[in-house]
Amino acid sequence: MVKLTSIAAGVAAIAATASATTTLAQSDERVNLVELGVYVSDIRAHLAQYYMFQAAHPTETYPVEVAEAVFNYGDFTTMLTGIAPDQVTRMITGVPWYSSRLKPAISSALSKDGIYTITN
């Protein structure tokens, strides 16, 4: 007789190896948080480049939450909730290195988290 705990352990093992995927709208907050996480990491890694971009484009502003997240080296994701999806898109796609650096990094991060997006 097979023990119930053996069956449960087998099901748990199968579930752990299967990659869960979720399809979300691009405006979903979970997608935005992944995008913003990549964005904050990119700003930290290329701070001088972002400062030069900001100096050349003074009307391109960042929400205060993004600035706080850049300089807070702890868990910053909770700081970034509530930023409007259109503002996230504007910030991320508004830099010249979006296609070459941010877009591939965002795609990779979403894929790693099992998230796929659909156009709204």
UniProtKB/Swiss-Prot annotation:
Gene Ontology molecular function: any one: structural constituent of cell wall
Record-linked InterPro entries: SRP1_TIP1 (IPR000992), Yeast_SRP1/TIP1_CWP (IPR050788)
Gene Ontology biological process terms from the UniProt entry: fungal-type cell wall organization
N-terminal signal peptide: 1-25
Similarity section: Belongs to the SRP1/TIP1 family. Seripauperin subfamily.
Protein's recorded name: Seripauperin-13
Keyword list, A-Z: Signal
GO cellular component, one term: fungal-type cell wall
Native organism: Saccharomyces cerevisiae (strain ATCC 204508 / S288c)
